[in-house]
Amino acid sequence: MDEHLLNEKEFWLPYPIPSVAASERGFDPGWRAKTTWRGPTWINVNWYLYWGLRAHGRGDVASHIADRSIAMIDRSGVREFYDPRTGDGEGARDFGWTTLVLDLIAAERSTA
């Protein structure tokens, strides 16, 4: 995990976690090629990572993912996916599973 997930050249970008490592040739978080799973950050993926990291004793990393996810949605609104470099929202507006951020907020409040 430390070698890849926390690597700023792969997954640990300003608004983690991209669906493809930033070091991959096909990384396209700006959605230029209209390939949605080639780099954007998705809240449903962050939600799964958050709970998995907490379950395995990495609450510190989970909290960072939650904090950056909350900031990203606060900045760009409820969108389908986000650019992991800028936090800009892309795709559909008011996308349902992005409301999983509410679960992250509640979980973070319960651990504070």
Give the positions of each predicted feature.
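Extended, well-ordered alpha-helical scaffold segments
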Residues: 1-8, 57-72
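Extended glycan-interaction surfaces of carbohydrate-active proteins
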Residues: 1-41, 74-112
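Small-side-chain structural scaffolding
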Residues: 40, 50-52, 62, 66, ...
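Generic helix N-cap/helix-start motif at coil->alpha-helix transitions
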Residues: 42-46
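Well-ordered alpha-helical scaffold segments within catalytic/enzyme domains
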Residues: 47-59, 101-112
